[in-house]
Amino acid sequence: MEDQLTIFIISDSLGETAKAIAKACLSQFPGHDDWHFQRFSYINSQERLEQVFEEASQKTVFMMFSLVDVALASYAQKRCESEHYAYVDLLTNVIQGISRISGIDPLGEPGILRRLDNDYFKRVESIEFAVKYDDGRDPRGILQADLVIIGISRTSKTPLSMFLADKNIKVINIPLVPEVPVPKELRMIDSRRIIGLTNSVDHLNQVRKVRLKSLGLSSTANYASLERILEETRYAEEVMKNLGCPIINVSDKAIEETATIILEILKTNGQVAKNL
């Protein structure tokens, strides 16, 4: 037998959870750098377990296993006891305890936490995308986006982009301004990936005045004038009509309400369904 301690990490998924716990525990034993881990991932049958125990036969081993399959975990326990291996079952007692108290049966599916982690990183990627391409900073992002939101100023484009990015959707928003040509990329993508936003003239007049005031500017500036708002609104509606994209009037709608409408449109059109 080797004197060096080897910690066997046995999992029906990657084994990252068990390894993290093992590392936390070993930090309480400084000076034992010769102890090391050996990880066995995707152990989902008794045959695979037997291969692990065969490899353990010539080593000083401490077994740590995270197996959501109750029968497989029970088999691993019995094998450890019959071979006199020290072991700890990381999941069974906790899962059974929660199930007993809550009255809810566990899913029994390995790798769920890892899938949740993947979802988290996808969400972060989508949020970073929305920030990078906010307010039409780089129209080339249109070709990479799951969704393109277009509209004139103060139609909730940015907050909607961020809200939808949190749903794992890569969103770019493009401001429509009469003096600025429409990005050519808008005509290179499926119009079902584009959502146009409009607002009532009166509401736009009010929110733009508030915006000007917050910037320390006069509320009588052209930006908030009814004539300018009407000009922009007509221009935007013409662009949206030519593109053939769905149009949503966001007047008196909360961000969440508009986002729900957008998600339903995307689902109906079969767009970015993988993210929803």
From Swiss-Prot:
Signal sequence, start to end: none
Name of one Pfam family that matches: Kinase-PPPase
Reactions performed catalytically: N(tele)-phospho-L-histidyl/L-threonyl-[pyruvate, phosphate dikinase] + ADP = N(tele)-phospho-L-histidyl/O-phospho-L-threonyl-[pyruvate, phosphate dikinase] + AMP + H(+); N(tele)-phospho-L-histidyl/O-phospho-L-threonyl-[pyruvate, phosphate dikinase] + phosphate + H(+) = N(tele)-phospho-L-histidyl/L-threonyl-[pyruvate, phosphate dikinase] + diphosphate
EC number: 2.7.11.32, 2.7.4.27
InterPro entries from the UniProt entry: Kinase-pyrophosphorylase, PPDK_reg
Residues given in the record as ADP binding sites: 151-158
Keywords assigned by UniProt, alphabetized: Kinase, Nucleotide-binding, Serine/threonine-protein kinase, Transferase
GO molecular function, one term: ATP binding
EC class of the enzyme, as a word: transferase
Family: Belongs to the pyruvate, phosphate/water dikinase regulatory protein family. PDRP subfamily.
Role of this protein: Bifunctional serine/threonine kinase and phosphorylase involved in the regulation of the pyruvate, phosphate dikinase (PPDK) by catalyzing its phosphorylation/dephosphorylation.
NCBIfam families the UniProt entry points to: PRK05339.1 (NF003742)
Protein name: Putative pyruvate, phosphate dikinase regulatory protein
Organism: Streptococcus agalactiae serotype V (strain ATCC BAA-611 / 2603 V/R)
